[in-house]
Structure formats: C-alpha cells, structure tokens
Amino acid sequence: MEQYIEAFIMYLHNVKKTSDNTTMSYKRDLYKWMDYMKSLGIDSLGDVTKEHLTDFVAYLESKKFKAATISRNIAAMKAFYHYMYKEKIVKEDISDVLHAPKVEKKLPDVLSMEEAIRLVEQPSGDTPKELRDRAMLELLYATGIRVSELVGLKTSD
C-alpha cells in the first residue's frame, strides 16, 4: 500500500499541483489509514472493503478527532481511491460509501467599537510609517478586506 500512497502523493504534487500543506496532510492521513489497515492484518488494497473504510472513520471519531480533521481524512481517502481506480489499480472506487461530517462554522471574534477605535488610533504620529499604518488599519476596519489582500495592495490600486 505504501508504494501506491507514494505514487498518489507524487501525482498530487506534480500533476494536480496541490499546495505543500495539502500534500503533506493527505500523506499523513493516508499513512494513518494504512497503519489502521495493517493493524487489521490488511496489507493489500484489494483486500480493503467499504466496511473497512467506514470502520476507519468510526475509529477516528472514537479517538475524538474534530469533524474538520475527519473530513480531511475522508477527502484524502476519496481522492486516493479515485486515483487508484482511474489508474486501474483497484477494480472499484469503494470510497463512495464515505461522507464527510458537518464541520461547525465558528463565527469570528469581533472587536467592540471602543477596541476598534483604540486600534485605529494606535499609530498617532505623523511620520510616513505611522501614517501608512493608520491608513492600513482604517482600510481594514472600513472595508473588511483580508490582511493578505491588504498587504498585497499597491499604491496604484
């Protein structure tokens, strides 16, 4: 199984051009799944059943992994089996039995009006750096843009 996981990881990196974070997360998740399969005495992809996949998800839940982590593990297994099926390494994509749990969306913490005003007024001087910082903070507050968008702005924007 390890050789197939490594081939899949190379495919993700070289063909799909996934981010390094995604690639490493999928690799870690698939090795965790492989270790679980080996603990059941399963060393061949052909011996893995749909029940084994759902049992693995139940195992993750029993270990109190968060829904987002379980969801990513499921995404990794689905992508892996889709690739294995496409490459004709397995006869059937058995991952169709897997369904990701609902991931709770947490609302972000927001500043009170007083906190926001105090933050914007922090750069209080008239140096170019302080004026820049104040303009950036006011832009963040007024528009709600992401910090990554803010730091990517050019004066021509």
Task: List each model region and its residues.
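Conserved catalytic core of the tyrosine transesterase superfamily
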Residues: 1-157
